[in-house]
Amino acid sequence: MPNTQSPYTAFAALLSSNGHPVSPAELHGLLIGRSCAGAGFEADAWLADAAGVLENEPEDNVRAALIGLQEMVKAELTGEDIAIVLLLPSDETPLTERATALGQWCQGFIAGFGLNAGGKDLSTDAKEVLQDLVAISQVQEALEESEDGESDYMEVMEYLRVAPLLLYTELAAPAAPAPKPSLH
């Protein structure tokens, strides 16, 4: 087995070594939540929101990692893919730890979305997605180390890879340009 760190583990080590007691999953959820609410992709605004969660101003290496994370999220949300990659522990991590990180991701998403949604009208589907995220954020301890628990985790994770795209499309995606009238 190769001794390479997962992106989650590497980011967790970076945050911890710089005195930031926050999960990479929560930060990633915060970033995607704020982006889906229409906050845009300005680095300074993202860094300001992240600083609130980090509990102190990020050092240069953490700032660079946060900006890199934002660029990745921007590419995912504005690209052609129909799913996002969640920053979560690897599959080799015990299910309870992965479930906790999944809950933290949802909590971060809800916080980021709430900070930036500013009273926007939401469709019924968008409201259901947010209700699902709130429910998922609270079921962390319900998943057990079993085949059923693993299956439930994978199902929830797959849902979370696509559900935010509905919110992004509804609230934040740039509108397609209106067709220009043709002159005859």
Swiss-Prot record:
SUPFAM superfamilies with a match to the protein in the record: YgfB-like (SSF101327)
PANTHER family the UniProt entry points to: UPF0149 PROTEIN YGFB
Coiled coil (residue ranges): none
NCBIfam families: PRK02166.1 (NF002562)
UniProt name for this protein: UPF0149 protein PputW619_5026
Protein family per UniProt: Belongs to the UPF0149 family.
One CC-aspect GO term: cytosol
